[in-house]
Amino acid sequence: MTQKVGVLAIQGGYQKHADMFKSLGVEVKLVKFNNDFDSIDRLVIPGGESTTLLNLLNKHQIFDKLYNFCSSKPVFGTCAGSIILSKGEGYLNLLDLEVQRNAYGRQVDSFVADISFNDKNITGVFIRAPKFIVVGNQVDILSKYQNSPVLLRQANILVSSFHPELTQDPTIHEYFLAM
């Protein structure tokens, strides 16, 4: 069965995710409207600016449709996408997870680091990255950086505080496709 991956495309770094999936031979749909959710099997919520993203979700009246989709289908949130999926006022509140926004510093503090995932070293690109500070019992920690979780999964939802789409390594995207 051919799967179609949707990439939320109202703000942020959606094109790099789309390009990564296309390089893997996966059909991609840029999701901008409520009816776009009807033709996809899984969704990526990309990084960007979480407050702006929330405002646009509400302005375009797709917050409820996004919530319903993310409640049952595979979803991957990177950076700001992970914030939107976590606990907090106005967030989707679908993860047993609390985050601290911009915990790794401002834009000028961005960095690249090696992290381990499934016995493989991968590159993590951290740009104004959130820190996962309260991780509930239902959440699996898949990878850490300096003893802090940076890649997590809870049921159908995968989140990273870093940007795997900004590397040439498809490891995390392949993992998401296999969920």
From Swiss-Prot:
A molecular function (GO) term: pyridoxal 5'-phosphate synthase (glutamine hydrolysing) activity
Cellular component GO terms, alphabetical: cytosol; glutaminase complex
Pfam families from the UniProt entry: SNO (PF01174)
UniProt-annotated catalytic positions: C79, H163, E165
Keyword Methyltransferase part of the UniProt annotation: no
Binding site for L-glutamine: G48, E49, S50, R101, I127, R128
One GO process term, biological-process aspect: pyridoxal phosphate biosynthetic process
InterPro entries in alphabetical order: Class_I_gatase-like, PdxT/SNO, PdxT/SNO_CS
Keywords attached to this entry: Glutamine amidotransferase, Hydrolase, Lyase, Pyridoxal phosphate
The enzyme's E.C. designation: 4.3.3.6, 3.5.1.2
Domain of life: Bacteria
Protein's pathway: Cofactor biosynthesis; pyridoxal 5'-phosphate biosynthesis
The reaction(s) this protein catalyses: aldehydo-D-ribose 5-phosphate + D-glyceraldehyde 3-phosphate + L-glutamine = pyridoxal 5'-phosphate + L-glutamate + phosphate + 3 H2O + H(+); L-glutamine + H2O = L-glutamate + NH4(+)
CDD domains per record: GATase1_PB
Quaternary organization: In the presence of PdxS, forms a dodecamer of heterodimers. Only shows activity in the heterodimer.
Summary of the function given for this chain in its UniProt record: Catalyzes the hydrolysis of glutamine to glutamate and ammonia as part of the biosynthesis of pyridoxal 5'-phosphate. The resulting ammonia molecule is channeled to the active site of PdxS.
Family the UniProt entry places it in: Belongs to the glutaminase PdxT/SNO family.
Alphabetical list of PANTHER family matching this protein: PYRIDOXAL 5'-PHOSPHATE SYNTHASE SUBUNIT SNO, PYRIDOXAL 5'-PHOSPHATE SYNTHASE SUBUNIT SNO1-RELATED
Protein's name in the database: Pyridoxal 5'-phosphate synthase subunit PdxT
Organism: Francisella tularensis subsp. tularensis (strain SCHU S4 / Schu 4)
Gene this chain is encoded by: pdxT
